[in-house]
């Protein structure tokens, strides 16, 4: 057991080090984005919503086709991938990194690796379910996809995408400030109250 844990830890450390090396040119930008997403200042949440709203308003006004939209998005990613490693050191000054910044960059890369591992783990579980319980897999997939299709039919595509993107960008800050755990705790307490009331009525 201990040997397996050590092997997993070593593999995680190796993957994290590899990712750090790949993203070294994005280090300054990632640290700045991390501060924004974790709401280190009070005006960061409205700034996030304002920028996202502006981008989606531009998309709504231009109304590009799917092919044009995908092409522009990929072109933007290619430009960012080329320009950011060149311009970031000149703007932020990578030589001025502190130990705290280096540690935070390591934590960000480690969290990204863990998130990727979770996604791969869920994907493998899905295929395991398909092999071991094909009927349950089939019903789960049909019901889930039907629900997603119904939501997509009821809500405009652009509005739905806007809500998803905004929620994902606000999620780290909500988690950092304990807002998610707070409301989950409130929901659990309310559910427990309802269950206790139901038990009393049955008695």
From Swiss-Prot:
As for subcellular location, the record says: Endomembrane system; Endoplasmic reticulum membrane; Endoplasmic reticulum
- Which residue stretches are annotated as topological domain Cytoplasmic? 1-41, 87-133
Question: Which domain of life does the UniProt lineage start with?
Answer: Eukaryota
Q: Which InterPro entries match?
A: ER_autophagy_membrane_reg
Under the heading Pfam families, the entry gives: RHD_RETREG1-3 (PF24456)
Q: Where are the transmembrane segments?
A: 42-62, 66-86, 134-175
Q: Which GO terms describe its biological process?
A: apoptotic process; cotranslational protein targeting to membrane; endoplasmic reticulum tubular network formation; endoplasmic reticulum tubular network membrane organization; negative regulation of apoptotic process; positive regulation of L-glutamate import across plasma membrane
Give residue ranges on the Lumenal side.
Answer: 63-65, 176-203
Q: What are the record's GO terms for cellular component?
A: endoplasmic reticulum; endoplasmic reticulum membrane; Sec61 translocon complex
Q: How does it sit in the membrane?
A: Multi-pass membrane protein
Alphabetical UniProt keywords = Apoptosis, Endoplasmic reticulum, Membrane, Transmembrane, Transmembrane helix
The entry assigns this protein to a family as follows: Belongs to the ARL6ip family.
Quaternary structure annotation from Swiss-Prot or TrEMBL: Homooligomer. Heterodimer with ARL6IP5. Interacts with ATL1, TMEM33 and ARL6.
Q: PANTHER family, per this entry?
A: ADP-RIBOSYLATION FACTOR-LIKE PROTEIN 6-INTERACTING PROTEIN 1 (PTHR20952:SF0), ADP-RIBOSYLATION-LIKE FACTOR 6-INTERACTING PROTEIN (PTHR20952)
Q: What information about domains appears in the record's comments?
A: The transmembrane domains are required for its ability to shape the endoplasmic reticulum membrane into tubules.
Q: What does the UniProt function comment say about this protein?
A: Positively regulates SLC1A1/EAAC1-mediated glutamate transport by increasing its affinity for glutamate in a PKC activity-dependent manner. Promotes the catalytic efficiency of SLC1A1/EAAC1 probably by reducing its interaction with ARL6IP5, a negative regulator of SLC1A1/EAAC1-mediated glutamate transport. Plays a role in the formation and stabilization of endoplasmic reticulum tubules. Negatively regulates apoptosis, possibly by modulating the activity of caspase-9 (CASP9). Inhibits cleavage of CASP9-dependent substrates and downstream markers of apoptosis but not CASP9 itself.
Protein name (database record): ADP-ribosylation factor-like protein 6-interacting protein 1
Q: Which organism is it from?
A: Pongo abelii
